[in-house]
UniProtKB/Swiss-Prot annotation:
NCBIfam families: L27. One of its GO terms (molecular function) is structural constituent of ribosome. Belongs to the bacterial ribosomal protein bL27 family. One of its GO terms (cellular component) is cytosolic large ribosomal subunit. PROSITE patterns: RIBOSOMAL_L27. GO terms for biological process: translation. PANTHER family: LARGE RIBOSOMAL SUBUNIT PROTEIN BL27M, RIBOSOMAL PROTEIN L27. It comes from the Bacteria. This is Large ribosomal subunit protein bL27.
Length: 96
């Protein structure tokens, strides 16, 4: 009499499905670097931004990536105009 042999082979490792999570981008570190009323030296970065969220005022330059920087040594002053925010640099804060 012949015996039928029933052999089942199981996986030694469980098949694991991939996940769609697990990635994240580095923070861009945008925003104000110098606050209102603080003293800044020439060339200091005042505000990092995407687009002109804040516009340049007196003695403030704009970089190619819309970064605002000081042109002179002085005090930072943020102001609100009708439809836009603006930042300026003054040598003496009492003149404002």
């Amino acid at each position: 009499m012949l015996l039928k042999l029933n052999i089942q082979l199981f996986a030694s490792k469980k098949g694991v499905g991939s996940t769609r999570n697990g990635r994240d981008s580095h923070s861009k570190r945008l925003g104000a670097k110098i606050s209102d009323g603080q003293y800044a030296t020439a060339g200091s970065i005042i505000y990092r931004q995407r687009g002109t969220k804040i516009h340049p005022g007196y003695n403030v330059g704009v970089g190619s990536d819309y970064t605002l920087f000081t042109k002179i040594n002085g005090f930072i002053k943020y102001t609100n105009k009708k439809n836009k925010k603006q930042v300026s640099v003054y040598e003496n804060i009492k003149k404002i």
